[in-house]
Every structure is written in C-alpha cells, then in structure tokens.
Amino acid sequence: MRLVHAVLLPGIIVFVSNGNLLHAHALHEDETGVTAGRQLRAAASEVFGLSRASFGLGKAQDPLDKFFRKIINSRKPIETSYSAKGIHEKIIKAYDRHVFESKKAHDRHVSKSKKAHGRHVSKSKMAHDRHVSKSEKAPIQYASVADYLKKIYPGTDIERIVSTLKRHDEVGAKDLGAKLQTAVASQ
C-alpha cells in the first residue's frame, strides 16, 4: 500500500493512502489544549460517515481535498459536534493567513526583483554613457597626442614611432599606433 504524505492546509498534516484517511495531525494546539488535529479527525469522521474507531481504516466517500475545499469555500462551518469549538473557523483563518503570507512574500520578491532590475538597467546605462563619452572624446585626445609628438619629434620621426607601435606584439600598442596614424594623417 503506497502512503502519500501531504500538507493540505497550513498547520495540518494529513496521511492518505489509496483514498483512505489514515491520520490527520495538527502542528499547533488550540487554547483549550485539545489539538486541532483531533477536532479535524472527528469532523472528517462525521463528514465522511466514519466512526472514530474505524477512522484509521475507513474509506473516504469524497477525496480529501474536496472535504477541505468544502470547508474553505463555504466560509461557514460544516455541521458537526465539533463546530462549536471553532475547528472550521480555525482552518479557514489558517488558510487565509497562509494565502495572505504567500501573497506578501510574492509581493516582496517582485518588489526586490524590480528594484534589482532597475539598478541593473541604471548601471548598464551609466556604463554605456561612459563608454560613448570616451569614444566621442577619443579622436580629440589622439589628435592632441599626435600634435604633441609632432612638436617633440620633427619630420619622419613621428611616422617611425607610429609604425613601430602598429607592429608591436601587444594589441593595445597596435591599436594606439593605428589611432595615432589616423590622427597624424588627418592633420
């Protein structure tokens, strides 16, 4: 016989096997000292027409989730001798609290995600703007470097320096040589 363990409602653990309700257990005790689980078992017993003695082996007439859905959707107690003790109200409140907490957690997650996305977009835009700004300034900078080199190295010396840079093994030096050559040629 395959045993299925499920948490069907916050705070209530239910063990089911092939449609048989084997055990319902509450994680918290209520203020009277009687566990909500005992009240739940008794309520399920009455709804499913099971006596307390045969409760462990009795066959449920409806799937368990229908029983819980009946309690939650009706928003009013199913008539049992335990209704007065408020088990149904507690189940509904626990379910509502669970839904509310889940929604709050979801909203916090969405809010954090939106903030993180906004920061990412902002940083990306700033990096892009810096990059664009550097490339716009670059021709002016290389032109001023070329001017300076022309003043220091007269005649063909500047062309020799640029040519040496272009043949250099390092990519940065080659790139600098090419940009300086463009700047020198445009002057």
Swiss-Prot record:
<dbReference type="InterPro" id="IPR031791">
    <property type="entry name" value="ATR13"/>
</dbReference>
<feature type="repeat" description="4">
    <location>
        <begin position="126"/>
        <end position="136"/>
    </location>
</feature>
<comment type="function">
    <text>Secreted effector that acts as an elicitor of hypersensitive response (HR) specifically on plants carrying defense protein RPP13. Recognition of ATR13 by RPP13 initiates defense responses that are effective against oomycete, bacterial and viral pathogens. Due to high polymorphism, ATR13-Emoy2 does not recognize RPP13-Nd, the RPP13 defense protein from Arabidopsis thaliana ecotype Niederzenz. ATR13-Emoy2 is recognized by RPP13 variants RPP13-UKID44, RPP13-UKID65 and RPP13-UKID71.</text>
</comment>
<feature type="region of interest" description="4 X 11 AA tandem repeats">
    <location>
        <begin position="93"/>
        <end position="136"/>
    </location>
</feature>
<keyword id="KW-0732">Signal</keyword>
<feature type="region of interest" description="Disordered">
    <location>
        <begin position="104"/>
        <end position="136"/>
    </location>
</feature>
<feature type="signal peptide">
    <location>
        <begin position="1"/>
        <end position="19"/>
    </location>
</feature>
<feature type="compositionally biased region" description="Basic residues">
    <location>
        <begin position="111"/>
        <end position="125"/>
    </location>
</feature>
<feature type="short sequence motif" description="RxLR">
    <location>
        <begin position="38"/>
        <end position="41"/>
    </location>
</feature>
<feature type="repeat" description="2">
    <location>
        <begin position="104"/>
        <end position="114"/>
    </location>
</feature>
<dbReference type="GO" id="GO:0044196">
    <property type="term" value="C:host cell nucleolus"/>
</dbReference>
<keyword id="KW-0843">Virulence</keyword>
<dbReference type="Pfam" id="PF16829">
    <property type="entry name" value="ATR13"/>
</dbReference>
<dbReference type="GO" id="GO:0005576">
    <property type="term" value="C:extracellular region"/>
</dbReference>
<feature type="repeat" description="3">
    <location>
        <begin position="115"/>
        <end position="125"/>
    </location>
</feature>
<comment type="similarity">
    <text>Belongs to the RxLR effector family.</text>
</comment>
<feature type="compositionally biased region" description="Basic and acidic residues">
    <location>
        <begin position="126"/>
        <end position="136"/>
    </location>
</feature>
<dbReference type="InterPro" id="IPR038525">
    <property type="entry name" value="ATR13_sf"/>
</dbReference>
<keyword id="KW-1048">Host nucleus</keyword>
<feature type="repeat" description="1">
    <location>
        <begin position="93"/>
        <end position="103"/>
    </location>
</feature>
<feature type="region of interest" description="Highly variable C-terminus domain">
    <location>
        <begin position="137"/>
        <end position="187"/>
    </location>
</feature>
<keyword id="KW-0964">Secreted</keyword>
<dbReference type="GO" id="GO:0030430">
    <property type="term" value="C:host cell cytoplasm"/>
</dbReference>
<keyword id="KW-0677">Repeat</keyword>
<keyword id="KW-1035">Host cytoplasm</keyword>
<feature type="region of interest" description="Leucine heptad repeat region">
    <location>
        <begin position="50"/>
        <end position="92"/>
    </location>
</feature>
<protein>
    <recommendedName>
        <fullName>Virulence protein ATR13</fullName>
    </recommendedName>
</protein>
